[in-house]
Regions:
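Basic, Lys/Arg-enriched C-terminal extension of HTH/homeodomain DNA-binding domains
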Residues: 47-83
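Short, mixed-charge, low-aromatic patches
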Residues: 1, 18-23
Length: 83
């Protein structure tokens, strides 16, 4: 199954898993998005990774859990980018 995850999606999911806030993620080196764009990207990921019936009330924690379950991010290799 291809969820069409790009580099920025992976970085967003990885840093959410590490406990970064959206504001902290926007300040990462090479992350060309503001908070609104990060929120839009997060909502887009929710739409791609959850069925219509599962999407209600999905927060960042649940999104990260799904990404781990689908092996989009690897719990054993969660390293932050250089800031």
């Amino acid at each position: 199954i291809n969820y069409d995850i790009d580099e920025y999606d992976e970085r967003l999911l990885r840093h959410l898993a590490l406990g970064y806030t959206k504001e902290m993620i926007t300040n990462l080196k090479g992350m060309p998005f503001g908070v609104k764009s990060i929120e839009k990207r997060q909502n887009d990921l929710i739409n791609r990774l959850f069925t219509i019936n599962e999407r209600s009330g999905v927060n960042a924690c649940r999104l990260v859990t799904r990404a781990l379950e689908l092996r989009i991010i690897d719990i054993d290799n969660l390293e932050p980018d250089e800031e």
